[in-house]
Design a protein with these regions (language model features):
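Bacterial N-terminal signal peptides that target proteins for export
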Residues: 1-11
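Membrane engagement elements in two modes
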Residues: 5, 16, 30-32
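C-terminal motif of bacterial Sec signal peptides marking the signal peptidase cleavage site
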Residues: 17-21
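Contiguous segments within soluble domain cores/interaction surfaces
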Residues: 23-120, 124-141
Length: 141
């Protein structure tokens, strides 16, 4: 009888540990919006786990939604970060590598931002009006 009680107690304890671990994993996947802009009826959002862009390697999400917040199917998109020339510093253009996801209108972006400071995120995509473009100012820390 004592062994049976110990086994049941151990099974319950393991179940709590597994549930706690699953809860932590699920909450870490949420991303925070860095910036959003509109192009026609489409809202374009740039997000990351931290809600920031930093100097160096960045993993971002580029999303396209309609006025109701529903995903807009975008067959092709590009993302480039531009910093104009300043003084002796030449202009910088950091192109993101985009990959599709299982969600329509959502792309994963990987980009190496060369320096801290103000950048212009330049987005081009195939929308309902043909090739559309949008820009948004972002700050790399």
């Amino acid at each position: 009888m004592k062994i049976r009680t110990t086994v049941i107690s151990l099974a319950i304890a393991i179940s709590f540990v597994i549930l706690a671990a699953c809860g932590r994993t699920g909450s870490s996947s949420a991303e925070k919006t860095i910036k959003s802009t509109k192009s026609g009826d489409t809202t374009i959002s740039l997000s990351s786990a931290s809600g920031e862009i930093k100097s160096g390697e960045n993993d971002l999400t580029l999303s396209f939604t309609d006025a109701a917040g529903k995903p807009v199917d975008v067959p092709a998109a590009s993302l480039k970060f531009h910093m104009p020339a300043m003084g002796a510093m030449a202009e910088m253009n950091d192109v993101a590598t985009l990959t599709t996801t299982d969600t329509p209108g959502k792309f994963r972006a990987r980009v190496n931002i060369e320096a801290e400071g103000s950048w212009e995120a330049m987005i081009s995509f195939q929308g309902s009006l043909g090739t559309e473009q949008a820009t948004m100012g972002v700050n790399a820390k």
